[in-house]
């Protein structure tokens, strides 16, 4: 990252548009847009093209990537623009109720978390071919670390309040503590269960009496569940 304040004069028209889209979203709703939203607004057809532009903006000092979180992007510097849309966003914010509105500097503490779809055998969970989308999530809710999201399928965790269709945010780590909810890989499929270890071995426990505990000796712990999200 360059030293000192980023230079807006170094931006291309497209990069300026991307930052404008990010800035307007932060002002209006308190968090940045998704990768797909950025692409739609900037005329980029693929998420890889958006990712390339974000990387260029990182080099110029407008965004920051944590080397320990290769799939996360923290929005750090948003140039003050005088575009018509930016002025409209600022005016809309001034007219909106202030309760619950976040300071843009605080809203900048946001990571784009990859949504993982089908998982290729042997590949890392956040390998490019596994990622379907990125979602911006506030750090105060999901914490830090190398994060990814999985959608829950099935009712095995119903009694813990984790339902089919929910999204779980997972922090990548190869180990777990007793009683923690984890995402684990078993026979090529991801599952969410409670981690349990006793004299009889290691188990992945469901929270639904109609499901049986799963022996976990051959399971791969992908990470700890840190948040659950649900669309109402």
From Swiss-Prot:
The active site is at residues 156, 193. GO terms for biological process: DNA repair; DNA replication; negative regulation of DNA-templated transcription; proteolysis; SOS response. Residues 61-85 have a biased composition (Basic and acidic residues). The keyword Transcription applies. Coiled coil: none annotated. Its EC number is 3.4.21.88. CDD domains: S24_LexA-like. The keyword DNA damage applies. Residues 61-104 are annotated as: Disordered. It catalyses: Hydrolysis of Ala-|-Gly bond in repressor LexA. The record marks 121-122 as: Cleavage. Residues 35-55 bind DNA. Residues 86-99 have a biased composition (Low complexity). GO terms for molecular function: DNA binding; serine-type endopeptidase activity. Homodimer. Belongs to the peptidase S24 family. NCBIfam families: lexA. This is LexA repressor.
